[in-house]
Amino acid sequence: MATCSAACARPAVVVFASPAAARRRAASSVYLPGRPLRGGGVVRCSAGPVSGGMISKKVAELWAAARSASPVAVIAAVAGAAVVYKVGSSLLAPPPPPARPREEPSEEAPPPPEPVQVGEITAEELLQYDGSDPEKPLLMAIKGQIYDVSQSRLFYGPGGPYALFAGKDASRALAKMSFEPQDLTDDISGLSLLELSALQDWEYKFSSKYVKVGTIKKVLVEQGGDSTADAIEEAAVDGEDSILTAKMSNQLLYEEEMEVGSDDP
């Protein structure tokens, strides 16, 4: 059987032949049963030694050198290989990602000032505590009771969802959950039981969460240039005059009757 080594150390020489010679060579290379192969049936190849054998030989030489070396030399060689591997891996490793810039901590909002008692003030005076002046506390009233809501400036301060209630007695608006300007008043007449219950819940929430700092002073409404107090006083004076007039009339009638009685025999 014809055999040939798989690899050769030197490249093979390719010879181009004429067509006729190629046909003769092909015909002579066809194997027929009962016909012996030319050249003894052996195909020779002048290939050199396989490169794999050289590698195996080098490994064997290194192994023999390691066996003959002293333990100190072996340990030193292993340590050197480890150092080389460490250095090589560090050089080939991808660079670390750039450090992210350190974010400066945001400035925290200063805590709200301590509640200050304002005492008894009018509704007009309460308007100046609607949050437009940051130096003043943020106040709001329910049923005439004033509370300091400065700690909830995000809700009741300028731009907040309930900023419309700040600086006012918003009892009716809270009871009806209304944002209409005509409901921003302390007048709770005509409210339903459900609305009064909602207002009571709001009052409980405010009294338990916020500090009460004052009350709203009741101002009598003027009508026709005279206040209600003047009207009451005038009514009292008129009443006293009527009583006095009635007494005088009764006295005159009594005196007339006495005179008539004295003329009779």
From Swiss-Prot:
The chain crosses the membrane at residues 63-85. It comes from the Eukaryota. The keyword Nucleotidyltransferase does not apply. Keywords: Cell membrane, Lipid-binding, Membrane, Signal-anchor, Steroid-binding, Transmembrane, Transmembrane helix. SUPFAM superfamilies: Cytochrome b5-like heme/steroid binding domain (SSF55856). Residues 120-217 are annotated as: Steroid-binding. The keyword Cytoplasm does not apply. GO terms for molecular function: steroid binding. The cytochrome b5 heme-binding domain lacks the conserved iron-binding His residues at positions 155 and 179. This is Membrane steroid-binding protein 2. It comes from Oryza sativa subsp. japonica. The lineage of its organism: Eukaryota, Viridiplantae, Streptophyta, Embryophyta, Tracheophyta. The gene is MSBP2.
